Amino acid sequence: MSGCGEEQDPDEGTNGVGKLTAKQIEAKARKSAEGADAVRLSGTVVSKGSSYRIDMRLKENGGVGEVSAKDGPRFELLRLAESLYLKADADFWAHDGKGGKQSAADKQAAGKLEGKYVRVHSEDPSYKQLSAFTDMKVLMEGLLSLDGEREVGERKEIGGVRTVQVMAGEGGGGRLDVALVGKPYPLRLERGGGAGVVEMAEWGKDFTLRKPKKEQTVDHGEPGAGSGLSGS
């Protein structure tokens, strides 16, 4: 006969991953992420030594969203399959990876690009870096990496969902919060070495990617002209 002072099972009503070891929880989270069709990523990531704030919706064949460099430019990215577009304001295009004072001609040319979807070709030096922000597989492989001995950390709630944390290297190698309700998706990652914090939401929620209308696009065939980040 159970007494009224009996403690409630902390895993009651959960998916059960809270009972697993840290390595098992991490493996479940990784498997869930790999099997998802779509996700929304928001937070801070470090790429090639530079810090970027991102808010991207991603799926298998592309992605769309906003990227802003720390103390630097803000721009929008849209990718459908191999077609990558960048949208930014005139100030972004006026500087386009160049320093110093801009000429009147530079400013005039930049004004024509403001608010347009500029095609970034695969030959552009920045194509690989920019397209990585829109590639679900590439981003998830890079983000879901912990370094050091794993242990089960604290439980909390993220976006109203109960989570359990996997901690690596006593926290210095990263912290991954995994959903305890529904599929064990990773919901938040604090990357090791101060390399950013990213939240993951809307797992499996499909969305439509649309190619910009012809009048909204500019095809910059000149190598290096379509990015503004080639020097990053």
Regions found by a protein language model. Name each.
Residues 1-53, 214-216, 221-232:
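N-terminal leader/targeting segments and the immediate start of mature chains
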Residues 143-151:
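A short, amphipathic edge element
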Residues 153-216:
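Gly/Pro-enriched, hydrophobic low-complexity segments
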Residues 33-37, 88, 121, 147:
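Sec/Tat-exported extracytoplasmic proteins
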Residues 131-142:
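Transition segment at domain starts
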Residues 34, 70, 157-159:
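Surface-exposed coil/turn segments at beta-strand junctions on protein surfaces, enriched
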